[in-house]
Amino acid sequence: MTEPWKRQENEETIFRTCAWSPPGCHPTGCGLQVHVKDGRVTKIEGDPDHPITKGSLCPRCLALTEYIYHPDRIIYPMRRAKEDRGQDKWERCSWDEATDLVANAAKEITAKYGAETIAVFGGTGREANNWYPQWANLVFGTPNSVYAQAGWSCYGPRMTNTAFMMGGGYPEIDYAAKFPDRYDDPRFVPPEVILLWGKEPLRSNPDGLYGHAIIEMMRMFGTKIICVDPRVTWLGTRAEEILQVLPGTDTALAMAFIYVLAHDDLVDHDFIEKWTYGYDELVERVQEMPPSRAAEICGVPEEQIWRAARMYGNAKPSSVAWGLATDESTNGAQLGMCLVALMAITGFLDAPGGTTLGMGDDQGNVVREGGSISADDKVDDATDSTLELALKHGIMTPETWFTKRIGVDKYPCVGQVLWTVQPDEFLKCLETDNPYKMHMAGFVSSNPIGTAIGAEPQRWWKSLKKLDFNFAVDLFMNPTIMACCDVILPVASTIEHDGMVVTHYGLNASFYGAQNKCVQVGECKSDVEIMIEVGKKTYPEFWNRFEDDEAYNNFHVFRSWLPWDQLRDNVVTMSNEPYYKYKEGKLRPDGQVGFPTQTGRVELYSYMYEKFGEDPLPYYEPAAYGPTTMPETMKNDYPFVLTTGARVQNYFHSEHKQVPSLRQITPWPEVDVNEEDAKRLGIEEGDWVEISSPYGAVRQKARVLATIKPGVVHCMHGFWYPEEEGSEPNLYGNWKSNINMLMPNSVNAKTGFGNTFKSMICNIKKVHELGGPNEPERVVLERSREAEFEVQETWRPVDGPVQDPIDYEKELVEH
């Protein structure tokens, strides 16, 4: 039975596959070897033949066996009466019954109120990003797919920067990730300097960047690091410069970097002359932000700004990695404009050792074209986007797409680049029934009232509960499902279904990885299988053509790359994309040289931002809730700046909290406090701390550190207590440590993007307990289980401290 992707050893079959999700993970596509005996996973290890990860794995993949066989996992369809929402009164049902309930509700609501009154939610960074717009457009015919994070504050703003300034794709540091022989490829030149701005890729491996590659290049080639972060991260301890910027002031610092490069003439005039537009206007604009002024705003020494910017400007080549700091701020678009400019004006954009560009994803083009779409634009189904298929087959009309999608009339910038609603406006719609009343929601690997993405989650809770019908596609019970849903459709994990993972969702593809099905657990089905089953009952004229998920994937997912059998056998197929694609006509759909923008150049002066009513050049604007913007009367009440969103390796946002080995690493939510601030407030390591803002208060345990900027606290996001009572009002302790309780909605930039996640005012004080029982009794599990499920305890707190083996921030290295 030996094939390229599986082999037999003794009594085991060993499968090679690439990880994505579920459980949650970014599309980094780490290589797995999954050992299976008698239909059950016995061991998971890294795949040494994977050209990027080379056998290494994060704790989440190593704990995948615990995850898929956890006794709390949902492995059968479940239903519950609407009047029992909020209570644990679920009953097992058949797949046919469950999909009938979903499809019949959708058809009835569409007939009575219109398909637009149905919404489909999706989570962040997961494979479900592929599916929830397809659920919306192709299964239900609604334009309203929802990513519920206030201000669409993850990846979308960066996509907008690249779309508006460069025409698309996604810029990423060069670590030879596209070449089969990696660092040995003669085209590759290692970066001399990497500028890490608001990013800790060792923990997050974000969106396709394999973070450990930075360590490889530091060790092999002497690559140097500049970190911009209010916290000294593990990479920060090894950086040449760590600029501990005050959260919310990054744009001022980035403008000062451009000022230094222009002042010292550390720019590539040939590239600027041939391939950029608006350089002179940009230089004129940054004259208002010399390093002396930026130092006062950012809390970074002026001489360090000069030194770090010169280090970046003198490096040949240099590369930029930008993180969530670009997205989760109301001034984030302007920060992104500056960082794209820093990539470009040094001349190392899509150059060896610089910042690579992707050739883009053709499904993104239809969204960027905005109002030019019609149902007759294309005739070949096999090359159509999700939206084009929905229009062509009469599942959705152009009028519905352009006039019924919530929030894009107020924020057309969001509607131009993305395929979803504007989330803050959608929440208002739920609350006010304006412009129309919503009646149904589906949650595809999404937990909007939970602890990961939804600001003011109590508002989402109250609004979603009142809908006529709700369903979820997920693996575990969570607060949203318990509070709001009527049907659960159990979805397969990454090693339980066939599929494909592409770095950066295809916007900058390093490789195409096969997700090869290794095992079957219970009655779980893949996202695609579930879509097909429901779709055949809502729009059979379109969906009946697909016998299985392979047929659909070959038709609509793999068509741009490789046939499934070839993708599966390769396991990893490197993209092998060249450098300097803009010189060879590989970025523009017309095949001409240059960039797919109005000018054919990198637009440092952005016509697209200008079109949508935003300044075409970057500018600094203080945070909406910050030390300089709050009223004097509030300054004593909220003397700290709160930032959140940093990753821990053992969790993905709100997932994995019930997995014993992962919970043991970080058993409690943690708030990072500077040691001087802690001493002044009488806070010691491990104390319970209450964090409050004008919007609410929650509790987390203190980590007292020298490595976080004084006056700044960082709070862990995504924490809940699945070992606690699930029924309302507790909802698994959803409200106790949920830092999103402190964040407002509708604090957006002119574009509709950004929020306060990276910069919010707060106060902290020592308290004596979490609140409620700190050590609840172990959940008694009395569920019917197949023999494959071994007896296993749900995690519960233990006495005494637990050592965190990956507590990098506590390790300081002196240079």
Residue ranges with predicted function:
Residues 1-496, 583-585, 590-594, 598-600:
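Catalytic alpha/large subunits of respiratory electron-transfer oxidoreductases
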Residues 42, 341, 465-469, 477-499, ...:
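C-terminal, active-site-flanking charged/polar segments
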Residues 42, 268-269, 305, 319-320, ...:
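Acidic/polar loop patches that form or flank catalytic/metal-binding clefts of enzymes
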Residues 170, 517, 521, 527-572, ...:
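Long, contiguous, secondary-structure-rich segments that constitute the structural scaffold
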Residues 177-182, 187-190, 381-404, 496-524, ...:
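Extended, charge-rich low-complexity interaction segments
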Residues 229, 309, 322-326, 359-360, ...:
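Active-site proximal loops enriched in glycine and acidic residues that flank catalytic Cys/His/Asp
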Residues 368-375, 382-384, 395, 401-412, ...:
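Long, low-complexity segments enriched in small/aliphatic residues
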Residues 430-431, 435-441, 445-450, 462, ...:
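C-terminal substrate/ligand-recognition segments
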